[in-house]
């Protein structure tokens, strides 16, 4: 009996968070979820983040990582390098597409923001976007064999996340902006 009570008490914060998340949704999204026409994401994983940096990790010249969302079954790889083109040009922070175009990302100040298109409309395009941010602590190994945590080396560096699997939650859902052509 005590184990069941402990389990219920441990699950209460997660249940309350999900209830608050659903309660804060616009009416039309809540209606889609109620009819099973839309699967809202809850959590995501950033996997195997690696990067190259010419300044020891202060800025990243290129990086790649995996994105996994079990709730929507989206599993894709993401890459940024010198040939990457932003998928938006509307004055917002530039975002870049993963291999699965439903997922975009922004690297800023040591964090990755992931944006996942959800609730496809009649045209097949996502009507809404869920977004969440995860800090990505990195360690860089410089060309001279030195190791620097979060960007203190000065030689060309290979960098990787301190964790191979970074868990994060989506915290926002908004109407999808018009597509950039």
List each model region and its residues.
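Acidic, low-complexity intrinsically disordered segments
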Residues: 89-181
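Short, surface-exposed loop motifs enriched in S/T, G, D/E and P with embedded aromatic residues
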Residues: 24-25, 76-78, 170, 175
């Amino acid at each position: 009996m005590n184990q069941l009570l402990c389990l219920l008490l441990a699950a209460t914060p997660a249940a309350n968070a999900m209830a608050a998340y659903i309660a804060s949704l616009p009416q039309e999204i809540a209606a889609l979820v109620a009819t099973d026409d839309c699967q809202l994401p809850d959590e995501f994983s950033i996997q195997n983040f690696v990067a190259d940096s010419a300044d020891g990790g202060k800025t990243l010249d290129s990086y790649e990582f995996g994105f996994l969302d079990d709730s929507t079954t989206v599993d894709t790889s993401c890459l940024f390098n010198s040939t990457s083109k932003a998928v938006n040009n509307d004055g917002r922070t530039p975002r870049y597409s993963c291999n699965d175009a439903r997922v975009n990302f922004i690297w800023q100040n040591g964090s990755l923001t992931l944006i996942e298109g959800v609730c496809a409309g009649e045209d097949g395009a996502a009507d809404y976007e869920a977004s969440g941010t995860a800090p990505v602590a990195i360690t860089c190994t410089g060309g001279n064999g030195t190791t620097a945590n979060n960007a203190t080396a000065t030689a060309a560096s290979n960098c990787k996340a301190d964790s191979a699997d970074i868990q994060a939650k989506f915290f926002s859902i908004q109407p999808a902006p018009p597509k950039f052509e």
